[in-house]
Amino acid sequence: MTRKNTTTNPWAKFHGPNLGYVIEQYDLYVTGAGSVDPELQELFEIFGAPSFQDDVVTGDNTATHFSPQNTGNIEKILKVVQLVEQIRSFGHTLAHINPMEDAANGQSLLEKAMNELSDADLKAIPAKTVWQDAPEGIHTALDVIHRLKEVYTQTLAYEFSHIQDSEERAWLHQMVESNSLRQPLSNQKRTALLKRLTAVEGFEQFLHKTFVGQKRFSIEGVDMLVPVLDEIVLEGAKNGVEDVMIGMAHRGRLSVLAHVLEKPYSHMFAEFKHAKIEGAVANSGWTGDVKYHLGREQVVSNEEVSTRVTLANNPSHLEFVNPVVEGFARAAQENRKKSGLPEQDTSKSFVILVHGDAAFPGQGIVSETLNLSRLNAYQTGGTIHVIANNAVGFTTDSYDSRSTKYSSDLAKGFDIPIVHVNADDPEACLAAANLAIQYRMLFKKDFLIDLIGYRRYGHNEMDDPAVTQPQVYKKIKNHPTVRAIYADQLQAAGVLNADEIETITQFTQEQLKSDYAQVPPADTSDATIHVKVPDVVAKGIQSIDTGVELDSLRAINEGLLSWPEGFNVYPKVKKILERRKDALEENGKIEWALAESLAFASILQEGTPIRLTGQDSQRGTFAHRHIVLHDTDTNETYSPLHRLPNINASFSVHNSPLSEAAVVGYEYGYNVFAPETLVMWEAQYGDFSNTAQALFDQYVSAGRAKWGQKSGLVLLLPHGYEGQGPEHSSARPERFLQLAAENNWTVANLTSAAQYFHILRRQASILGTEAVRPLVLMTPKSLLRHPLTLSTASQLSEGRFQPALEQENLGMKPNKVKRLVLSTGKMAIDLAAEIESGKHEYNLDEIHIVRIEQLYPFPAEKVQSIIKRFKNLEEIIWVQEEPRNMGAWHYMAPILFELAGDKVKTGYIGRPDRSSPSGGDPFAHKAEQELIVSHALDVKYNFRQDKLEIEVFSN
């Protein structure tokens, strides 16, 4: 072929969509139907109509001497350009991506353009006119259309038109259209792929026949999930990835454990058989979990590379593992051993999330997690999503489970490329996997594979799916497995003969039988209803000296009040900070936020990294923290905690998106994978934390008992009744206390800045040890600057956290004390404020108050020792501001009954049972609160004298 001279042709540089634009503009120029760009107008005036005669390729079967100078040819070229773009954008509607259906019928989207162009029209147009990167052998527009339909409408289908970045979109189209994705596999790799499919199918069928009726949530129908994961993992390893994190639900999990994470078949069989086998790793938690929820960590390798693969433990709450695994990855990517922000390297780790086709659009946690993918505080350099699409959710058909054409459509809103692939075409599936990992490593963004198959059995193996999907399951019953399909293809291609295929099958069966033979008989001899909690957990957190030398605290405070020369701190913030200057001097007072900053700095100086996130955490919801400063002239930010001396640990504080569930899951995951780091999540108001309830229930409270998964996550939940209504009053401490058992976490509601300082330092000291556990803190709002919560420097430099505190200047005459009042948090401060105010006369000799700072584990020994001092004690009263059916009362009642014994009565003073946490009228709130306080302090106030009866005040 020869190319003619193009030096005099100004139109030669226009191709494809750009060409279409020029032609449209010329048409407007000729007809005067609209405005034309001045530069193009000048070209039209000088050179006339766009002419491509100089750019015509000559040779056999090519278009020659084609000129668009007449309107008819212009329109034809424009229609071809539009058709090319329609094939790219809508080819997926024609593709054969569902193995249970014939090729999709999306012809209507393309047929209009096709009908308006004859083959002769298409043959007359040079390929380069409509496809600049047309490969060798593509000469005419007809060749272009045939080639693009072949690429875009087979068993691989693509959705890229929503991608906003033109460079990414061009790269994706080039990868697809150049056919580099579908290069023939070597016979060796094809044989290996068949062996893998044979192992997957053989394993599932062996379980089905051997353990009849036991749940396993089979992978059959999307068997290619395992080779797809294999491909992504090993290609990632070739790119230097050190950690691959996988999150998935129960469907197909056993096969992924056995094959991708190389869990021995014998260990899997032992779990089904309830047998003990040497070398098997038992459930690390003391209560355990079902086999299809368990995770595993394994170094996976081939002859060339290796990488560590982690499959996260997972409850049956679909998709909630997603943010947890993202947190794993971020923790693995960051170097936290230097001061300042941690250094992130996204090439060290990446995430694979396996979704269900019903769960991906159905669970809101999916979109919450996707929203994290481009945010500074949460991005992990791209996640590869695989929808294991079996076209049914339990018994619900897809038309009842989503409002979109594809289960993957949600991803379009987050600019994620999507590939749909027929799970019965193994080589197409591997091509999709390769495109996914290449895109992720190059662009550091998410990619989605919609792996479309079917579910061979019911939701679980005891379920009959034909009851609800009779027609589909008639098809499935007669549909060959992907292993059988691929074996036939390899035999037809001469890669393997029938005997060789049978040998592969027999080898798999012999391996399964051999591994099963290693499993001893079932052994339930140690089964017991008495769960043994490890001693280190049962003992609780030991008392730890957490004081910091006064000179060190003063030096830290000086550093906290310093910023670079020329940095313009907002005047109001500057005034707030300058008030802290003398807080550690004699007669100085330390408020909550300063105590926190001092704790953070001292923890960092001891080598513990800190990560704090929340919706307003840099400033603080209540404008109290100001840990990140903003220059008023440049908006540049500065955190003094990044510049303090003697620190070799990172500090990061981030404002989070308006999400609770995904962010809590992320921070939990980060802490699990970075156990040496003090990870803290702060709710904007504690009331909103319940949108993350599934994370508290399934992970934070129970992760160690179920899976041996330790966490030291800190939850900061602003709590306190201040007349602000039902959504700005309660962190619902009753929920956390209901979940409290087996020393699984600490629940506290503090009354002083010093207590906050010490409990943070205590929490930091147990990180990375067997004693670690989460910390749930009901944090203050109005108490942040309350005079009665301020502390002195000596209270920080000396001592330790106190689970219970006695009210000063009360109980001085033990023999006169008749009433012991127990309360916590703001309620205790309200009582103290009333006493200090002196507005009312109370017989304070007859009353003593104990602040329960640590609600769980309850400081029983401390409280018991206080009770013993008062020989004439008549009653123990629990006082709270929450309604009786909320707050700590139902948790405290049995504890107090036991402490009181037979001779001392126990009672309750507080609001009555209510369905809403708080009223909306601030005046009614104030009246109620005053009544609670006065009743608590007035010994003459009689509650019912019946044994163990409870008094509830009513309006």
Swiss-Prot record:
Its cofactor is thiamine diphosphate. SMART domains: Transket_pyr (SM00861). The keyword Cytoplasm does not apply. One of its GO terms (biological process) is tricarboxylic acid cycle. Pfam families: E1_dh, OxoGdeHyase_C, Transket_pyr. InterPro entries: 2oxoglutarate_DH_E1 (IPR011603), 2oxoglutarate_DH_E1_bac (IPR023784), DH_E1 (IPR001017), KGD_C_sf (IPR042179), ODO-1/KGD_C (IPR031717), THDP-binding (IPR029061), Transketolase-like_Pyr-bd (IPR005475). Keywords: Glycolysis, Oxidoreductase, Thiamine pyrophosphate. Its EC number is 1.2.4.2. Homodimer. Part of the 2-oxoglutarate dehydrogenase (OGDH) complex composed of E1 (2-oxoglutarate dehydrogenase), E2 (dihydrolipoamide succinyltransferase) and E3 (dihydrolipoamide dehydrogenase); the complex contains multiple copies of the three enzymatic components (E1, E2 and E3). NCBIfam families: 2oxo_dh_E1 (TIGR00239), PRK09404.1 (NF006914), PRK12270.1 (NF008907). This is 2-oxoglutarate dehydrogenase E1 component. It comes from Bacillus cereus (strain AH187).
